[in-house]
Amino acid sequence: MHAPPTATRRSGPRRTHGIMARLVRLAAGVLVVTLVIGALTALSADDAKTHPHKVCIHDELQQSLLDSVAQQGLAPQRVSRVGLPYVASATAAPAAQVGGVDFALAGDSAPDVTRSAEWGELRITVSAEELTDPAYHCATVGQVISNHIDDYVTCTADDIMTAEKLDILMNYLIPEALQMHKDRLQVQQVQGTWKVARMTSYCGRFKVPEEHFTTGLSNTDFVLYVASVPTSPGVLAWANTCQVFSNDQPAVGVINIPAATITERYDHLMVHAVTHEIAHSLGFSNAFFTNTGIGQFVTGVRGNPDTVPVINSPTVVAKAREHYGCDDVTYVELEDAGGSGTMGSHWKIRNAQDELMAGISGVAYYTSLTLSAFEDLGYYKANYSNAETMKWGKDVGCAFLTGKCVVDNVTQFPSMYCDKDENVYRCHTARLNLGSCEVTDYTFDLPDYLQYFTVPSVGGSADYYDYCPYIVRSPIGSCTQAASSASPFVSAFNTFSMASRCIDGTFTPKSTGGATVTAHLGMCTNVACNTADKTYSIQVYGNGAYIPCTPGATISLDTVSDAFEAGGNITCPPYLEVCQSNVKGAMDYESMTNSGSGSSRPAPVEPSGSGSGSSAATTAPSPTRDGSAAADRIAPRTAAVALLALAVAAACV
């Protein structure tokens, strides 16, 4: 994801100034920078905790588990072709001590389970006993606990599992994520009772109710054990499959959702991050792709001499042809960049940036691409009527998949890729952020197949995108950030909330937040979504009322708000681009129209384990909000942002 350390940003065109003016500005800038360095350190640290850049470490963890299982020396018939152990039998069996880990023996072959002949709801049991046991999660600052991977960590204030965070986790994040899968995937349900085998590696570090080993689980097709312990910087959550049924279908999984990443109830990024990780535990993984035969390697992709992982199964190919509008598709690329945590278990972000199973965080739509991969594994039946729509790559044709994104300095796909470094805000394609195009000039020439500009050392800033230039999200431009902590610069023309989305336009705010960069091509507006009629209204900066926004219509900003200069406007995007998966936007509409009584949210999950097979039970403890603590956190951030605004002003005059 990151540019090589030798890369330097290639600046776009700027106004010419006199030498004296430059010296004055430089002196002012040096003074401000001297003041701001300490504040920026605190600001960047706070941003990392509040809006971390998602890094997926799935494959790295999966390989660690596979290596651990292989080292146990289990009989071949007790290990699946995926390399994971089978669940224990549903009847009593002796136990063997293997390498310090108890495994329930299944006999001479994998334990069979009886399945329904019909397809039915995917029943997921959630066990979260760790969240009520202070020995397994951060209960006090300075406490030392296992991170469930390979180390012990010291708990900080951000790591504490407060009552509010527990409420968000158990009553919103997990139920919403589970429902995303249950609405779209069916299984041939397991009949009767089955038992979990005692586990090794990081799977064995999760707290499992003893009855899951002895009595077993019923009415359950998959059991998920939940932890909340600190993890590596930039990781929102991680999950994996631990055990499988006799047909290699995932049966047991684990997920860790660190308390430090739980901040807001309707956080779109976190809901989809949890959904993404649960998908890995359900089998969206290189290990399953390879061992079921749907994953392959090809060479020569867009001139790339290296082998590239792909899926070439029939349903995936058919759905890709529909999405991209290309009948020549014979495979869909998986990620070949990003290292061992990302390669092979995600769609290639160049081709599917906004998909649920792309390798970095984003809007993460659950599209027919991911559904078809699940279906072609053979374990699931997909409900394509509930597939979400992704604008990225939609009907762009074969050239997008086979050709270059930019040719002779000109983008071939302007809705996705750009070609000029710029100093203006516009909407990121996912509409959750403001951003700008970044073009980088490296100190070396890029390979021929990655050269898009007449200068061979120039390209985009990320290897994930094959160095295609794209709209990079601004670190201060999240539409869903708290308004109270937003910088003065972006606060001058945006509205922020969990329902806010970015809308394209051309306008100049009357207030510039201390900077002289005044013209913009996008703004964050609150969105209220009428899910019944597929219509929406928006609230722009400077106007407390919501106004209808008809897709394709242009709104003159000076007619609806006094905050903008005359002549500015915005253009209403399609309904799906601002309302699909916008849970808070739908709730805000219901609240405004007093029609919320009929709405239903997924049931909460109980923070304790049982073998009943139900993923919905009693609610978690009621949260208690600490307003004073929140104010204390905001105050230093606000000061840092104020100093940052001064630095921006000094640099932009």
UniProtKB/Swiss-Prot annotation:
Family annotation (PROSITE patterns): ZINC_PROTEASE (PS00142)
Annotated compartments: Cell membrane
Main location: membrane
One GO cellular component term: side of membrane
Catalysis performed (reactions): Preference for hydrophobic residues at P1 and P1' and basic residues at P2' and P3'. A model nonapeptide is cleaved at -Ala-Tyr-|-Leu-Lys-Lys-
Membrane topology according to the record: Lipid-anchor; GPI-anchor
Cofactor: Zn(2+)
GO biological process terms held by the UniProt record: cell adhesion; proteolysis
Protein name: Leishmanolysin homolog
The gene coding this protein: gp63
